[in-house]
Amino acid sequence: MQDIKTYLSTAPVLATLWFSSLAGLLIEINRFFPDALTFPFFSF
């Protein structure tokens, strides 16, 4: 039972950190490449 409580208390924290870092990354990409449909570092 203690393991379930530990899991439920850490999963939202990890999800919040992951989504916050992902949102920050997307914001920074849009800051350097505004309104880009294709990104220069993805074109081969």
Swiss-Prot record:
Location relative to the cell: Plastid, Chloroplast thylakoid membrane
Q: Which InterPro entries match?
A: PSI_PsaJ (IPR002615), PSI_PsaJ_sf (IPR036062)
A GO CC annotation given for this chain: photosystem I
**Which Pfam families does the protein's record reference?**
PSI_PsaJ
Question: What membrane topology was assigned to this protein in its record?
Answer: Single-pass membrane protein
Q: Which family does it belong to?
A: Belongs to the PsaJ family.
**Name of the protein:** Photosystem I reaction center subunit IX
User: What is the organism field in this record?
Assistant: Welwitschia mirabilis
Query: What is the phylogenetic placement of the source species in the record?
Result: Eukaryota, Viridiplantae, Streptophyta, Embryophyta, Tracheophyta
Gene name per UniProt: psaJ
